[in-house]
Amino acid sequence: MRVTAHEISLTQRHVWRSAREAIPVQRALVVEVEQDGVTGFGEASAFMTAHYNSGVDQLHADLRRIAPLLADLGPDDPFAVWRRLFAALPDSPFVLAALDTAVHDLRARLLGVPLWRALALDSPQELRSSFSIGLDETEMMVHKLCERPGWAAYKVKLADPGDLTVLEELRRHTSAPFYVDGNCGWTLSRLLPVLPALQDLGVQLIEQPFPRSAWWDTRTLKQHSPIPVIADESITSMQDFAACAEAFDGINV
């Protein structure tokens, strides 16, 4: 298989803000894996570059390093390909994900079937997704929601869980469930007292409220929260799985 990468820059409609950072432009690589004139596609995003070892230069370097290995492999068994790639690039999860996706896509295209069928899965039915609203002034966050009506759920970035103004204003414009995301920026003392109010406002999921190192706080929250608590930044590999299983109700994949 032959690999090619195309660097892209995606300008956000609105500057993407969370409790951790602001991103006006998202850089990424579109990764192609080709065999016999057929191409599969994947994507590697330069996101949280220090945390995930995912700077664009590093992504390019890892792809160049793995290209000779791919040249000797075929797409007939994507799971075997992934094991070979992981052994060679254990510290490059975004490149691994892009190549894994592309190889699965390539195999399905070579077979002439949808990906779900190539994986021997049932046909997808009634897939649901949420629309994410980045951190901003309250009026702008309401504007972002009103630009995208009708979603099954809205994930809302919040700087402070104790400030319910944003959720109260958003609730005036939709009956859809809310997911709230702290992006590692909250504290247990601010979150615990407002759990009943968050539940009353239709919050169905709390994502990564505390820093990655705050395992005790997260375990305590899980014990007391009527709302499921989901890991994001706390899991970067299977080595984090046991700790996350104890501290969280689920994982954002």
How would you describe each model-predicted region?
Residues 43, 100, 105, 181, ...:
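Acidic active-site catalytic centers that drive phospho-/nucleotidyl reactions
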Residues 31, 37, 99, 112, ...:
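Conserved, mostly hydrophobic/aromatic
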Residues 213-253:
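Catalytic alpha/beta core domains of metabolic enzymes, predominantly
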Residues 40, 178-180, 229-230, 251:
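Residue-level marker for buried hydrophobic side chains located in beta-strands
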Residues 5, 33-34, 39-110:
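Metal- or metallocofactor-binding catalytic centers and their adjacent structured scaffolds
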Residues 1-27:
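Short, Gly/Pro- and small/polar-rich lid/capping loops
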Residues 115-225:
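Metal-dependent enolase-superfamily TIM-barrel catalytic cores that perform enediolate-based chemistry
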